[in-house]
């Protein structure tokens, strides 16, 4: 090895030096800084370009405004501009404008499309049965009204007739049937369809399908009909396609005088339909009312909360009656709408009232309950000095002396802690059981349907424990519970000052309304002076009841109380009957008596300590439950209380609670 020499061609070996951690991280940081500088430079350049573009836009805008000011055009308000709006150019030549309309009718689905845009589609199960009606503006083609009438149910055909009669001449009418629409389609409705030019509508049969397009007072533009082949089946689906020529804007407008009221009217009538003479060109119905002031009005500054949803035609009718009542203060009225629906707010604006919308909370009964809570809370927040609030619903007619009735009785709520509310509604006040508009009662139930609520009761008791959104409870049933009422009573009139006209709602249909609401008596006499109002205070009322029972003639208990002959053919007398009532919640006989008297019998209402007061044959009729009522002492020793046994319940028959 002594003679070994390294090759001159091989590079000398040297140990590889490992890069330190410091140099490694320095290298990485240098690269990151370079990337960051590059991004920052790009961002600055982008901002510079944006600033330059914006400056150019501002200069162009100023130049355009300057040019416009040199040649100004007459200023146009909303209503004038609306009249000159042209709809989009439809197919056709020249000035002829045409809508393409499709209408579909079947067992489970209906739809309407206008120029390819679906304006109605209903395929929900167990909903939307009956005749769907759409109204289009004949000049613009926009939808002015959408309604569905369940003409399988009673009285819905009457509502349809009323609506169609209120549509202005010239409007485009579209009708289509879902499921079944003929069962309660009476002759009056068929005659109206015939007058519109329909051939199939008046002959509509069980489960037929039908689609119709026409102008009111003008030609039929298309119609299709499929007859059901058997009772157990439906007609084939029909699809109607037709052209609808549009008319000029001049034909669709009214030329009212330019006033603030008419501007409100024009705004309303250009958007919606089905409100009759309020949109008449020749003689429109007033939208401002001047009822007589109420002397010594004790409810002048009491806020009025109108609880509403998406039933604008109901709201329109209700507000007209409310604003016509003597002593009304429009500035105290607030309409609370459950949801952001446009047409109810249009109705509110038409009358120049305050409207508040809010997002619905909950479903079904819970949604209604939360709507009431939100509305009541908002009312007392809007009027922090108010001691009371009047609560109304959108489906009530209001009597002309509604505020007079409240003005004469509201002091009772201040002076008597044993009172829960004052209500304008008598649950048992039917045409054949109510007689005296000056007479008041105390009752253990809370009727609602036009009532006065004390602020302290709501803020201190009800609001803190109001049912939460997940509880599917009816708010009024909750308020009637003993835990809320706590032995307190409500003041009601013998003759109601409100009338429940609504037949469409969460817990309402035509059958139910026909049975329990249609024949309620409603006061139409103005200026009624209530009699002996202070006798409604707790102690005084007991004196009054004992006086009545002492003067009352005991009826013959061997007779059937359901027969007309049970009461003599007299007038102005006071009679009393004693029925079996073993304990406070034993209402077996009363329920059967209420049923045969054709008054409210689904649960117990209108009673005071086991006593019911009503009229029969214009005689004051008292019913006392024995032995539960303290007034049982007035029963003659020899008399036997009347007992009416309920009929045996049929197997599978629904109970009262299920029927409501």
Swiss-Prot record:
Query: Catalyses which reaction?
Result: 3-O-(alpha-D-mannosyl)-L-threonyl-[protein] + UDP-N-acetyl-alpha-D-glucosamine = 3-O-(N-acetyl-beta-D-glucosaminyl-(1->2)-alpha-D-mannosyl)-L-threonyl-[protein] + UDP + H(+)
Q: Where is this protein found?
A: Golgi apparatus membrane
Q: List-wise, which residues carry Phosphoserine?
A: 7
Q: Where is this region: Catalytic?
A: 300-646
Per the record, membrane topology reads: Single-pass type II membrane protein
**Any Gene Ontology biological process:** O-glycan processing
* Keyword vocabulary terms for this entry: Disulfide bond, Glycosyltransferase, Golgi apparatus, Lectin, Manganese, Membrane, Metal-binding, Phosphoprotein, Signal-anchor, Transferase, Transmembrane, Transmembrane helix
Q: Per the record, where are the segments of Acidic residues compositional bias?
A: 68-80
Alphabetical list of CDD domains matching this protein: GT13_GLCNAC-TI, PANDER_GnT-1_2_like
Cofactor binding, note field: The manganese ion interacts primarily with the substrate UDP-N-acetylglucosamine.
What segment(s) does the record annotate as region Interaction with O-glycosylated substrate glycoprotein? 473-481, 506-512, 600-605
Q: Could you tell me which cysteines form disulfide bridges?
A: 254-281, 269-279, 421-490, 562-596
Cite the InterPro entries for this sequence.
Glyco_trans_13, ILEI/PANDER_dom, Nucleotide-diphossugar_trans, O-linked_mannose_GnT, POMGNT1_PANDER-like
Residues in compartment: Lumenal = 59-660
Q: Where does Mn(2+) bind?
A: 395, 500
Q: What class of enzyme is it?
A: transferase
Q: Which cofactor does it need?
A: Mn(2+)
Q: In which pathway does it act?
A: Protein modification; protein glycosylation
Q: Name one Pfam family in it.
A: ILEI
**In which family does this protein belong, per the annotation?**
Belongs to the glycosyltransferase 13 family.
Q: What does this protein do?
A: Participates in O-mannosyl glycosylation by catalyzing the addition of N-acetylglucosamine to O-linked mannose on glycoproteins. Catalyzes the synthesis of the GlcNAc(beta1-2)Man(alpha1-)O-Ser/Thr moiety on alpha-dystroglycan and other O-mannosylated proteins, providing the necessary basis for the addition of further carbohydrate moieties. Is specific for alpha linked terminal mannose.
* Subunit annotation: Interacts with DAG1 (via O-linked mannose moiety). Interacts (via transmembrane domain) with FKTN; the interaction is direct and is required for normal location in Golgi membranes.
- Which protein, by its recorded name, is this? Protein O-linked-mannose beta-1,2-N-acetylglucosaminyltransferase 1
This protein's species is Pongo abelii
* Taxonomic lineage from the root: Eukaryota, Metazoa, Chordata, Craniata, Vertebrata
